[in-house]
From Swiss-Prot:
Synthesizes alpha-1,4-glucan chains using ADP-glucose. Belongs to the glycosyltransferase 1 family. Bacterial/plant glycogen synthase subfamily. It comes from the Bacteria. One of its GO terms (molecular function) is alpha-1,4-glucan glucosyltransferase (UDP-glucose donor) activity. Pathway: Glycan biosynthesis; glycogen biosynthesis. Its EC number is 2.4.1.21. InterPro entries: Glyco_trans_1, GS/SS, Starch_synth_cat_dom. Signal peptide: none annotated. It catalyses: [(1->4)-alpha-D-glucosyl](n) + ADP-alpha-D-glucose = [(1->4)-alpha-D-glucosyl](n+1) + ADP + H(+). Keywords: Glycogen biosynthesis, Glycosyltransferase, Transferase. PANTHER family: ALPHA AMYLASE DOMAIN-CONTAINING PROTEIN, GRANULE-BOUND STARCH SYNTHASE 1, CHLOROPLASTIC/AMYLOPLASTIC. This is Glycogen synthase. It comes from Finegoldia magna (strain ATCC 29328 / DSM 20472 / WAL 2508). The gene is glgA.
Length: 474
């Protein structure tokens, strides 16, 4: 099968969030399973020169938008057997930021149309175009529009993945002019969203199939609490929406070979995980003692459940003999909150208000528990990484957290973590205390083993995507 995979970012070239992890690893697994996959992302100024100097220039073509003729430079690089294409236009991508520019609408409309035209330029007669999130949502709209008058595009089927419904690509109705699409697209059954246009809505309407990054999230977004104003559209098109849970790249996240760990370990010698814990305590100036170490590696924003953390942290640190390690940046109020708790409990909490990839590896290996009390979590990657390293997740049952973390049952000995259901601070505190109670008995090693035995690589997810593709091209 031939697949064009379009995204705004892909690891290891450019990364601002979890989308890059997916776009950088899922196509590799599809290739491994015997399919012809090509990935397309913009050629950002921010991509490391070490990669850029290896890119091969393939030529150029032009995209017409809003009565303008826009240059598209085409570069190619083969990464782990997969062809990655980088589309160049200095006006749009020679910026200091990936997102958040004043002309994001125009930038990603240009990129989306260029992705569709790229197929003809490289003569790639693909079966599937797979786009991701609002940045490339218009790819599927253009593919449908091109198919009306061009036989080259008639048989191509489209899939769109929602990684986070919160960010939809909503722009003023005047922005429709920048797309070069007919005014007929400004209707309720197309791009119109109140008095604006909505890229993500367009992808939901015009794609052959729509996926979310977990099965539970696909159900949740049908309701107003999670639907971000699009729940009506989600319910209308429910028949073509399904969930496929993300995986992780287990070659990168592997405690046996991870170069960042203080000491490598595996399920067979899991006791060596303790050496990572002791080294982590030393690194952050915490007392090296046998107490549970809880960690959070996250963006410090409200939807990560930080209001629940704010409500219980003082009581938790006052009453429990624990240590807490934080790694991440985000909203000022939450950054200051953790700085305050570090000041108040210097022997119990270390707040690292920054992000460092190497330190994240050390924390995943050295902590005993990972806290993820998210209000909503489309999939979540941190809990998958934590389990890979034998660090036990404590989560709220939402989205991908519900799909991947099974609360431990002390009678059947099944389960790979701990969970609670309600958005309630003391339910969270109770669950933390329940986790601590198992730290001091023999079941703790069983839970760690269950977590490490959880299969969270991309193999199963890639197979599900391929099955989905096969369904729609029959």
């Amino acid at each position: 099968m031939k697949i064009l995979y379009c995204a705004a970012e892909a690891d290891p070239f450019i990364k601002t969030g979890g989308l890059a992890d997916v776009a950088g690893t899922l196509p590799l697994e599809m290739k491994k399973q015997g399919h012809d996959v090509k990935v397309v992302i913009p050629l950002y100024k921010l991509i490391d020169e070490e990669y850029k100097k290896k890119f091969e220039f393939e030529g150029s073509f032009y995209v017409d938008l809003d009565f303008k003729h826009h240059y598209v430079g085409v570069f190619k690089y083969i990464h782990r057997g997969v062809e990655f294409y980088f589309l160049d236009n200095e006006d749009y991508f020679n910026r200091d930021n990936v997102y958040g520019e004043y002309d994001d609408c125009e930038r990603f409309v240009f990129f989306s149309k260029a992705c569709v035209q790229l197929l003809r330029y490289i003569d790639f007669d693909c079966d599937i175009i797979h786009s991701n999130d609002w940045h490339t949502a218009m790819v599927n709209v253009y593919a449908r529009d091109f198919a009306k008058g061009d036989p080259f595009y008639e048989s191509i089927k489209t899939v769109f993945t929602i990684h986070n419904l919160k960010y939809q690509g909503v722009f003023s109705s005047n922005s429709l002019r920048q797309t070069d699409l007919s005014p007929m697209y400004f209707t309720e059954d197309a791009l119109k969203f109140y008095d604006a246009i909505n890229f993500m809505k367009g992808a939901i309407v015009f794609s052959d199939r729509v996926t979310t990054v977990s099965k539970t999230y696909a159900d949740e977004i049908k309701y107003s609490f999670f639907g971000e104003g699009l729940d009506g559209v989600i319910r209308q098109y429910h028949y073509k929406i399904s969930g496929i849970t993300n995986g992780i790249d287990t070659t990168i996240w592997n405690p046996e070979t991870d170069k960042y760990l203080f000491k490598n370990y595996s399920l067979k010698n899991i006791k060596d995980k303790d050496e990572n814990k002791k080294a982590l305590q030393r690194m952050y100036g915490l007392e090296e003692k046998n107490v549970p170490v809880f960690a959070m590696v996250t963006r410090l924003v409200e939807n990560k459940g930080l209001e629940l953390v704010r409500y219980i942290m003082d009581e938790f640190l006052t009453t429990e003999d624990v240590q807490v390690v934080i790694l991440g940046t985000g909203d000022y109020s939450y950054e200051e909150m953790f700085k305050y708790y570090e000041w108040k409990f210097p022997d119990k909490l270390k707040a690292n208000i920054y992000y460092n990839n190497e330190e994240s590896h050390k924390i995943y290996a050295g902590a005993d528990f990972l806290m993820m009390p998210s209000i909503f979590e489309p999939c979540g990657i941190s809990q998958l990484i934590a389990m890979r390293y034998g660090t036990i997740p404590v989560v709220r049952e939402t989205g991908g957290l519900r799909d991947t973390v099974q609360s431990f049952n002390e009678f059947s000995k099944e389960g790979n973590g701990f969970s609670f259901t309600n958005i309630n601070a003391h339910d969270f505190l109770y669950t933390l205390r329940r986790a601590i109670s198992f730290y001091y008995n023999d079941d703790f090693n069983i839970i760690k083993e269950n977590a490490m035995n959880s299969k969270n690589d991309w193999e199963k997810s890639a197979k599900e995507y391929i099955e989905l593709y096969e369904e729609i091209i029959k």
